[in-house]
């Protein structure tokens, strides 16, 4: 399927209309007609990394040059361990060296780390410049490029420093997924499964039937998975941009998952891998609280297993998990707020989880030594 599909993120209820479009399809990197309305000064900074630059940077720069758009590239090291102040300053250095002005947009060409760093730089440089997301991983196309969360990690906690700052446009070129390593593809599927679990039981059913086609990168299957994921996220973000309510449900599995990433060291586990194990922990806790059935947890585990994702966390002591989870962004009045499942297709927040049940989950859901 080569037809382009579009999803609107409606953010027009505030003083200024910050709505934008997500375009999904094949070979969108060269669809400069989609980019030009957001390049008023005919100059742009392209932020990418050492992995993506050899694959797609010149393709994008050449297409822009044909329309007289001047660009320069900022090539960052690749990896979650580089999502920090030092790497962020590399972007600021380049923007200042090229005397970029407030109308100079930043284009994020890469995965979630590139997008988060570029967005935070755009939110901060000159107190705000435009930016565009061109995500090249499945995880970024279905999740991190949409919704305006930007930021960096701190040694004590993931994504603890950042800003809400919306892109002007998202171009999800599914053709870039052909060069994505299998491990990265599976990590992105973890976030796709999340959308079915929190919001759409029919989508979860569809994923059960189409997992092998997704893993085989069938274009039509992939485009539908991306579109449906973006539709769900756009709907939730439009209702709650700054995560004061329903948007927190998008963090299913992330309280446990961030603890895994932080404790094991950024980059040891891919974000999607940690979310997968964390989602199984959340499902186990939901079962112990009698919110969902054993049959539900079995279905969830089987789907993650069929995607080739971890269903057990690393062997960290419950105490270390708890220590890391206390630094979660959703902590309120000192209490950890968990996203739990009420059924497949519906989730809710709970800040009254008994410590004993939580410890049981943490003991049951880690790999054997």
Curated annotation (Swiss-Prot):
Enzyme class: lyase
Physiological role: Catalyzes the conversion of 3-deoxy-D-arabino-heptulosonate 7-phosphate (DAHP) to dehydroquinate (DHQ).
Species whose genome carries this gene: Nitrosomonas eutropha (strain DSM 101675 / C91 / Nm57)
An individual GO BP term: aromatic amino acid family biosynthetic process
Residues the record lists as binding NAD(+): 78-83, 112-116, 136-137, 149, 158, 176-179
Gene name in the database record: aroB
Paired cysteines (S-S): none
GO CC entries: cytoplasm
Name this protein carries in UniProt: 3-dehydroquinate synthase
